[in-house]
A protein has these predicted regions:
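Local sequence-structure signature of Cys/Sec-based thiol-disulfide redox active-site neighborhoods
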Residues: 2-27, 31-36
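Thiol/selenol-based redox catalytic cores and closely related redox-interacting motifs
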Residues: 36-117
Length: 117
């Protein structure tokens, strides 16, 4: 039986990303990993990744810029948010897991298990 292949966007210094990656390996996933620090997502990549989804879900509410700009109260436009995320990869909620057109933001063991079935 072949291993499930996933695309994993992460920051190696992120504890949650490390836990998620270890969990994926335990589940037997074949991981293609992208370090968002070394290889940030371009505006067009973010637009493609977000697609029809709510762009606000991709914003990390823990990020300093998110709090400084009070994005919870005054969310940026989709275009502005995507430009900000492209220039500030830490503003992107992570990790991002992509498999067969399905996307998961953050780390949720049950959701990961379900996606890999």
């Amino acid at each position: 039986m072949s291993k499930p292949k996933v695309l994993f966007f992460q920051k190696p210094s992120c504890t949650t990303c490390r836990k998620a990656k270890a969990f994926l390996l335990d589940l037997g996933a074949e991981i293609e990993s992208r370090d968002l620090d070394k290889d940030p997502l371009s505006i067009s990549e973010l637009e493609s990744l977000i697609g029809e989804r709510d762009y606000k879900a991709f914003l990390s509410t823990r990020n300093e810029l998110y709090r400084e700009r009070k994005m919870a109260e005054k969310p940026p436009s989709r275009k502005e948010a995507i430009a900000l995320m492209s220039n500030n990869p830490n503003l992107i909620k992570r990790p991002i897991l992509l498999r067969s057109g399905k996307i998961l933001l953050g780390f949720d063991e049950d959701a990961y298990r379900k996606l890999l079935k």
